Structures are given as C-alpha cells and as structure tokens.
Amino acid sequence: MAQPANQVGRITQVIGAVVDVQFDGYLPAILNAIETTNQGHRLVLEVAQHLGESTVRAIAMDTTEGLVRGQEVTDTGAPIKVPVGEGTLGRIMNVVGEPVDEGGPVKADGTRAIHQEAPAYTEQSTEAEILVTGIKVVDLLAPYAKGGKIGLFGGAGVGKTVLIQELINNVAKAHGGYSVFAGVGERTREGNDLYHEFIESGVNKKGGGEGSKCALVYGQMNEPPGARARVGLTGLTVAEHFRDQGQDVLFFVDNIFRFTQAGSEVSALLGRIPSAVGYQPTLATDMGALQERITTTTKGSITSVQAIYVPADDLTDPAPATSFAHLDATTVLNRAISEKGIYPAVDPLDSTSRMLSPLVVGEEHYQTARMVQQVLQRYKSLQDIIAILGMDELSEEDKLTVARARKIERFLSQPFHVAEVFTGSPGKFVELADTIKGFKGLCEGKYDHLPEAAFYMVGTIEEAVEKGKKLAAEAA
C-alpha cells in the first residue's frame, strides 16, 4: 500500500544511533516506528523527540552505517510491533520481532505494540505463594514469590548468569507453562549456549513448533543502544500476551543494568542533561515503565527473574538502587563469599524477601531462617576480634557460634546442574523441607561433631553426614 506523500521524510543528520528526519508538513507521533532501507535490510527507527515544526529525532534499532542524508524514511503510523503467541516459542527474535535463528518467518497469532500501559490496580492480583527453586540459600533466607519480581544483584564475575541459568533449569523445566528469556546487552556466546541447552534438555524443539516452551528475545552486547534499550520491552510484550491468555509465565531478563546503560548512551545523543553519575535524567521513569508492566493480573501471572549488574560492587549506584524499589525479593551476590569458593555466592545477610514472614512461610521456616541469620551476624561482628586477637581469646560460647557459622556458610553452598561440566560434581535440587531440617539441626548443634569440610558443596544434611563419615574413614 503506497503511503501518502507527506508521510515520507528525508534524513537530515546522522549522529551514531540517533537520526534526524525531516517531513513535509507532517509529524509522526512520539514512539512511532519509522522505516528505511539500509544496505538492503529493513532499518526501524523509533521517534524520540520533535524538533521544530517538521523534524523528528529518532533512535535506530540497528546499525546506522551506510545511511546518507536525503535518504527516504517512511512513517508506519504505529509503535514497533512484534509477533506474539505460541509461534514465538522455540524461536529467537530481535528487538523488532524479526527471527535471527535462520528458521524462517515466525508463525505468530498476531502482532502487539511493544509500548503498552501497565495493568490498572483493579486488575492486579495479590496472592502470596512461594516458588521453590531447589537452591538452599534462596529458599531458606530470601524465598521467591510466585508471580513476583526477583532481582539477582552482583558485580562482574560473581555468578549472576550461572544462577539465572540454574533457576531456568530448576524452575522452567519443571514448570508446565511458558517461559520468555530476554537477553539484554549480554554476551552473545551465553545466548547461543542457552539456545542449544534448551534444545538438548527438551525445553525447546529445534526450529520451534510443537512442544517448545520458551521464547528467546535477544539484543546482545554488539547491538546499538537503541536495540538494547528496547529489547526488554519486546520480551515483556511476548510474556504479557501469554499472561493475558491465562498462562503462568516465567520471564527471565539478563541484564537489567544494560537496559539502563543503553538508555544513558542514547540520552546524551538526544541532548538531555545527564544526572547523577552520568545516567539519564529519566532513569527512574524508564525503569518504572518497564517494571510496572511486569505484574500478575487476575488473568494470569508473570514471575520475573532479573539479573542486575552492580557497577564496581557499589549497591548505591543509581542503576541498581532504582531497581530495588520494584522487587519482591532481592538476592545479593557478594564477591567476598565467591572468593572463599562458596557458590552460589549469595550474601545471606544482605538478601531480602517480602515472603519471609511467618504468615506466608510458616513459623518453623521463619524461625530457622532468623536463627541462621543470627548466628551469621554474630560471626560477622566477631571477625574483627578474631583478626586482631585470634580465636583463643573468644569465650567458649562465641567459639561454638563461630564453628557453627562456618559450617552454615559452607552448607549454604551447593553444586549446580548447569555447572556440572566445569565442576564434575552432579547438581543438586534440595526440597524446602530438607533445607529447613538441615539448617535447624545445624543451629541446634546436632551436627557439631562433623568437620567443616563435610558441609561444603553437598545437597541435603544426610549427604553432609555421609561425607563426614567418609572423611573420618579417610583420616583414620
């Protein structure tokens, strides 16, 4: 269908990912998708600002090398629309919904705009139910909510992606419903590994189609900032469609920080004055627009797990700090713990969850979690004394506390299924009842006779006892 002549504009300026387009007596709306061809490929741009009477400033969703001034650009009259529905399962799409897995066109139920309103208060659901992950430290100290929002915070190389992959392994594979994975500005290698891992484990069928359970939406590190700033919304749009059909959806995002980072790259090019630490002035608004849409309604639920990179291990940095307010549970990964060789390197005192209340998890679970935190907190406060004076200067009671705390620390570690290839030890899924039983026994002193090494990288407490016997036999 030919566009009306005035809906065709011409490029007047190209600055990196930002392109100015002049129309004649016509202005496309903000957030509209406008299209041109670049070296034989369709290039989509999103209108970000109106400059003067007939010029718009747009953000490119793909590379702008090869664009020239005077080139024609057409307004589509609507925001970016992406395919949604069961045809997306097992497929990899990019930010504008084009397949990138060489599997032919996506057979979708229809398309949906990536910019949507967040559900109204009256449509939201407030049920409290725990999502068991099989990871001891998470289930005990900062349990996840079904239909809640979960953030995994950590600096570079402390294990966020491995933890998110283990959650996909433990939760998505056992989960009957659909999952959506949004790769936002992370390594392409990891995205490729995940795609093949899903096919090998039977979550997806090669080339999509019947039996696939997870849709993948990628805008990785090599993409321009426009794609990285919008790919999270594309993934969310696919997840929202499943939710509105009455499904319980799992939505994984790796990494939310890259969404913020892309926004800050584009923000300067758009001429906005930067705010704290050079971030965009609209940081909280951008984050809110994404996070408020990730919610559970009366129709269906979205349980989201988001990895959030912490620049220079500083949790007060504006990017991670802005996302804290939106989450139901936070799992904080700590470099000091990973340096001890304890994986997952979750900080048991810094991680929080609104589900850790006796009304939700029950009295026994709550008391056990608090006992564990009490012992670990006491150990933390004694560490200065130990460093200066040594263990001998502690009272008998404190010596016992330290011994138990060190055992608890090691028992919080656990071998992962996704790390089997690196570690050689088989992964463990620990049921919640076994987790509570093990830590309760540890705090009550039932296992004071076992050596520390017996608790390292095991699943249940029975395995620790078994390992203790084995170590004793070897020593004898």
Swiss-Prot record:
Localization recorded for this chain is: Cell inner membrane
Identify one Gene Ontology CC term for this UniProt entry. Answer: proton-transporting ATP synthase complex
Any single Pfam family the record assigns to this protein: ATP-synt_ab
One example GO MF annotation: ATP binding
What topology does it adopt in the membrane? Answer: Peripheral membrane protein
InterPro entries on file = AAA+_ATPase, ATP-synt_VA_C, ATP_synth_F1_bsu, ATPase_a/bsu_AS, ATPase_alpha/beta_chains, ATPase_F1/V1/A1_a/bsu_N, ATPase_F1/V1/A1_a/bsu_N_sf, ATPase_F1/V1/A1_a/bsu_nucl-bd
Q: What is its EC number?
A: 7.1.2.2
Reaction equations catalysed: ATP + H2O + 4 H(+)(in) = ADP + phosphate + 5 H(+)(out)
Task: Indicate whether Nucleotide-binding appears among the record's keywords.
Answer: yes
Question: Which of this chain's residues are annotated to bind ATP?
Answer: 154-161
Keywords for the protein's UniProt record, in alphabetical order? ATP synthesis, ATP-binding, Cell inner membrane, Cell membrane, CF(1), Hydrogen ion transport, Ion transport, Membrane, Nucleotide-binding, Translocase, Transport
Signal peptide location: none
Which PANTHER family does the UniProt entry name for this protein?
ATP SYNTHASE, ATP SYNTHASE SUBUNIT BETA, MITOCHONDRIAL
Function of this protein?
Produces ATP from ADP in the presence of a proton gradient across the membrane. The catalytic sites are hosted primarily by the beta subunits.
Q: How does it assemble?
A: F-type ATPases have 2 components, CF(1) - the catalytic core - and CF(0) - the membrane proton channel. CF(1) has five subunits: alpha(3), beta(3), gamma(1), delta(1), epsilon(1). CF(0) has three main subunits: a(1), b(2) and c(9-12). The alpha and beta chains form an alternating ring which encloses part of the gamma chain. CF(1) is attached to CF(0) by a central stalk formed by the gamma and epsilon chains, while a peripheral stalk is formed by the delta and b chains.
Q: What family is reported? A: Belongs to the ATPase alpha/beta chains family.
Under what name is this protein listed?
A: ATP synthase subunit beta
Q: What species was this sequence derived from?
A: Afipia carboxidovorans (strain ATCC 49405 / DSM 1227 / KCTC 32145 / OM5) (Oligotropha carboxidovorans)
Which lineage ranks, top first, belong to the organism behind this chain?
Bacteria, Pseudomonadati, Pseudomonadota, Alphaproteobacteria, Hyphomicrobiales
